[in-house]
């Protein structure tokens, strides 16, 4: 069975994303995702990173990451090849992982680097590009990974239906019945 884990990267409700929220997010996924499943994620901070964490903990047997940009294994960051301040998938990923890393007091991109260096983890990345188009290409790759019998977990700040977002973009592309929405408000202590 494959388990796709997607959702908030930390763009909203930053004040509620704490070192106490994170364990609740991971615990909820451990409860819902069968042990030994293959995890799939887009490599973003917070919700997507739950798949990396479950793999690190041995809960997932394999992991497939569809990253929005190349990753520098030495400096543990996403790279885009542009000099200066350019809005890109890499700069966005680094920004949100930077905030996430501060909360957890560890480099979460390093978690990804360590995961992709193991035999049980595969990954793809989008080529460097200005703008955020690579995020949507990555979303499509994540969505294509699943078929009936698999599952999707989406962690968002919505209650009920998902609002317009990158998570909803991926959610809408996935055509299986086992799709579960986890409200982040339920993860906050």
Task: Go through the PLM ranges and name each one.
Residues 2-187:
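Acidic/glycine-enriched connector segments
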């Amino acid at each position: 069975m494959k388990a796709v884990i997607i959702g908030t990267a930390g763009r909203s409700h930053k004040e509620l994303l704490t070192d106490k929220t994170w364990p609740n997010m991971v615990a909820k996924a451990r409860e819902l995702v069968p042990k030994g499943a293959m995890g799939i994620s887009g490599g973003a901070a917070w919700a997507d990173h739950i798949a990396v964490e479950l793999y690190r903990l041995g809960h997932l047997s394999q992991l497939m990451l569809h990253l929005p940009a190349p990753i520098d294994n030495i400096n543990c960051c996403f790279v885009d090849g542009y000099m200066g301040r350019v809005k890109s998938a890499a700069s966005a990923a680094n920004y949100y992982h930077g905030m996430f890393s501060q909360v957890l007091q560890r480099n979460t991109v390093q978690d990804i680097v360590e995961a992709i260096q193991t035999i049980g983890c595969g990954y793809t990345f989008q080529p460097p590009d200005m703008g955020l188009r690579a995020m949507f290409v990555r979303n499509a790759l994540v969505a294509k990974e699943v078929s009936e019998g698999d599952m999707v977990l989406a962690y968002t700040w919505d209650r009920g239906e998902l609002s317009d977002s990158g998570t909803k973009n991926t959610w809408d592309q996935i055509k299986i019945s086992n799709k579960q929405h986890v409200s982040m408000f339920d993860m906050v202590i």
